[in-house]
């Protein structure tokens, strides 16, 4: 579970965000990730999207060239509702627990897990390990034992750090894409090495 989740989160971070930046904003993902390095490390150490907002805002505005009008709206909203790392964790954790306790899930249950993971991740607080709390809702909805959440809690601290880094980089990527679409991106600042 741990290795798979880290792989999927890193894949989402590097591949999905790179494609979004290239396709929707025609921006170099390597420059983006290099400039977001310190923000990702700060998010990793705090495990809180909310605590990372000031650092993210400064980097998005000063280093990535997003105008303050866009960044001051997109980053806080993203820190509140953009929890894609959490949605990935909840889906994989539910499937891991089902497999561990010997429950075969139906296609309808898989669809329900995906739907609930997305919805609950939007409502998850931007504080450490909040996604694990909402995982109980998903487990209960597909009839899995809630006490199995202990399997996840044992390793969740490190995984939460990775999830938060993914979430925060997503906030910054969306800020760049929105800024580019609104002509509020200073590409010279973005491309400045």
Where are these regions (language model features)?
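Hydrophobic alpha-helical transmembrane bundles that constitute the permease/transmembrane domains
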Residues: 10-14, 81-88, 165-168
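Helix-loop-helix junctions within the multi-pass membrane cores of secondary transporters/permeases
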Residues: 38-121, 175, 187-193
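Transmembrane helical segments that form the transport core of multi-pass membrane transport proteins
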Residues: 2-3, 23, 28-29
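Entry/N-cap segments of selected transmembrane alpha helices
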Residues: 1-17
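Loop-to-transmembrane-helix entry motif
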Residues: 1-6, 36-40, 77-84, 158, ...
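Flexible, glycine/charged-enriched surface loops at secondary-structure junctions
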Residues: 29, 66, 71, 165, ...
């Amino acid at each position: 579970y741990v290795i798979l989740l880290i792989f999927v989160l890193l894949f989402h971070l590097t591949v999905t965000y790179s494609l979004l930046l290239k396709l929707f904003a025609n921006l170099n993902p390597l420059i983006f990730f290099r400039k977001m390095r310190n923000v990702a490390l700060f998010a990793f150490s705090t495990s809180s999207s909310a605590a990372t907002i000031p650092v993210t805002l400064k980097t998005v505005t000063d280093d990535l060239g997003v105008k303050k009008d866009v960044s001051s709206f997109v980053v806080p909203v993203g820190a509140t509702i953009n929890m894609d790392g959490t949605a990935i964790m909840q889906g994989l954790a539910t499937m891991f627990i089902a497999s561990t306790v010997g429950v075969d899930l139906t296609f309808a249950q898989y669809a329900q897990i995906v739907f609930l993971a997305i919805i609950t991740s939007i409502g998850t607080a931007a504080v450490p390990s909040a996604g694990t709390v909402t995982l109980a809702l998903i487990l209960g909805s597909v009839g899995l034992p809630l006490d199995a959440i202990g399997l996840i809690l044992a390793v969740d601290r490190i995984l939460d750090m990775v999830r938060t880094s993914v979430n925060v980089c997503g906030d910054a990527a969306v800020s760049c894409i929105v800024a580019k679409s609104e002509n509020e991106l200073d590409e010279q600042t973005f491309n400045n090495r």
